[in-house]
Amino acid sequence: MKIGVFLPISGRATGPETLTQAAQSAEQQGFDSIWSADRVVTPWQINTFYPYSENHEFIVPPDRPFLDSFTCLAFLAGCTEKIMLGISVLVLPYRHPLYWARVAVSIDRLSKGRLIMGVGVGWMEEEFAALGVPFKERGKMTDEQLEIVEKLWSEEHISYEGQFYSIQDVAFHPKPIQRIPIWIGGEGMAAMRRTAKYGDAWFPYYIDITAAQLRERFDTIRRMAAEAGRNPDQIQLACCRAIEVTRDAVPQEETRLRGTPEQLIEALNAYREAGVDHIALQFMVPRWPDRVEQIERFASEVMPHVR
């Protein structure tokens, strides 16, 4: 099982020194990937149901600095050598596919084939409104974008006619070094169907799920893929999970990753046994220095035992 760690691309301590240290340390410690999140703008008033916290309220203050995910990964491509560079996840309707496909290929080539494209439809209706993008059409827009990008990265004369995008006989060069993996974010049935049709991996971020439940839902995706004529073995199971390393043993819940190194080894091995190919971990510690300490403990005391 490969293991990734989220980067500090938001917060007042964020800057080139912190990012460089975080990425280079992760590479030296043996992590397989580093991850950035996506945000364009944060409205002051947010009423949309937030799916990634227990009280369903968005936990990031509107005035918290938030760096662009693509820019951070391009910067870190030159500061690292082998670690994979991932986005979790790019909200596709926020950008035209011709634009982000170009940026993605540029990062892939500058990093010598290390980019992972986590993609999703987005959730914050207020952010869609600020960008002038129709919230209710985000799923259809995402599907069209995935079809377009597949053409851009593989064909010479690219044309596409859809409900939202129209492209007539354009060239797109250079092509990516690798076949840039598309990891589909999202937890609902629509995201599962999208993974079965377009994805190289399913990449959900659940706050409350067991490894066995995750596997059960992935098996549903595999069945959908087979019904669509795809080889299910071409789709990987990946996931994002929040994690906390504690000093003392705590009561264990199958739906949480929280505990001592020994407890986390047992919990993460359940994910490995469930067939998870890659897990991206978000260490839930507010202050970056404290997070550094947790990441170091995890890398030395947990990671060697859960590969």
Q: At which residue positions do the language-model features occur?
A:
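Active-site-adjacent structural elements that line small-molecule/cofactor binding pockets in enzymes
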Residues: M1-R307
